[in-house]
């Protein structure tokens, strides 16, 4: 982890949002992926950032409004095809059966998509920006994190989007969170400890010393960014191409001190 000149982050939620938004709440002037200034008008991503995150030169369309997502999310949950977790999530995939010259669409597909979309909620309207900014801090610190970005709906609402790391062109990869490895029920995810997670990493990882070091870096980052929600399901071992398991990149990092100051 890189050295910090400051060891304490004293940010407000508005500070986090301002990292990806121009003053006054006007049109985004920075790339939703890398946060650097855009060089073209009418776009939300650099061409290189589109290629890096979506695998194509243009931003795929996401033809849903916030109200559309709320209605669709209810249908997905009732059909038992929702992505697991407390925060509302929708599974997306690029619609590839289109004319090669047309911009591809991101569509909701149930469980087996390539991306996970997290819209804001009524109680935590700026949660997508906070989660993406927290993971961006991991990137800046040199800590491996899942591919992530912000993306806009048709009504301008920003959502958090991440690329699934347990999916490849060849199929699904195994991914076991620490709740599963500790043989605990999901409702017991808060009944563990970082010491227990470290021991599980040492026991099951194919590269234990390297991975346990990376694990403690994630713990330190969580402390510095005010993240009080790193339970057993927020650390996982993921299968690689050789069939062995290693610590997954950081995911579900949220500055809970900003989102819910009472939970600190």
Model feature map: region roles:
Residues 1-122:
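Conserved NTP-binding catalytic cores of kinases and kinase-like/nucleotidyltransferase enzymes
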Residues 10, 153-154, 240:
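Acidic surface patches and DE-rich sequence motifs
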Residues 66-189:
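Conserved ATP-binding subdomain of kinase catalytic cores across diverse folds
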Residues 122-139, 193-259:
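Conserved kinase catalytic-core segment
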Residues 262-264:
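Short beta-alpha connecting loops at secondary-structure transitions
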């Amino acid at each position: 982890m890189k050295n910090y000149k400051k060891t304490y982050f004293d940010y407000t939620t508005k500070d986090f949002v301002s990292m990806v938004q121009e003053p006054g709440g006007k049109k985004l002037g920075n790339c939703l992926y890398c946060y650097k200034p855009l060089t073209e008008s009418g776009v939300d991503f650099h061409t290189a950032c589109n290629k890096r995150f979506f695998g194509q030169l243009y931003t795929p369309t996401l033809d849903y409004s916030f109200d559309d997502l709320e209605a669709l999310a209810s249908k997905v949950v009732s059909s038992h095809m929702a992505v697991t977790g407390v925060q509302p999530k929708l599974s997306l995939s690029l619609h590839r059966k289109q004319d090669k010259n047309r911009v591809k669409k991101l569509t909701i597909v149930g469980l087996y998509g390539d991306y996970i979309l997290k819209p804001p909620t009524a109680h935590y309207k700026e949660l997508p920006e906070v989660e993406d900014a927290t993971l961006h801090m991991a990137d800046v610190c040199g800590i491996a994190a899942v591919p992530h970005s912000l993306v806009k709906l048709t009504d301008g609402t920003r959502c958090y989007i991440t690329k699934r790391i347990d999916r490849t062109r060849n199929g699904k990869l195994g991914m076991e969170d620490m709740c599963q490895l500790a043989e605990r029920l999901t409702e017991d995810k808060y009944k563990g400890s970082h010491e227990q997670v470290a021991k599980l990493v040492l026991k099951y990882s194919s590269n234990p010393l390297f991975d346990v070091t990376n694990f403690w870096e994630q713990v330190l980052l969580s402390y510095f960014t005010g993240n009080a929600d790193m339970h057993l399901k927020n650390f996982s071992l993921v299968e690689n191409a050789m069939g062995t398991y290693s610590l997954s990149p950081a995911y579900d990092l949220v500055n809970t001190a900003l989102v819910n100051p009472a939970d600190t």
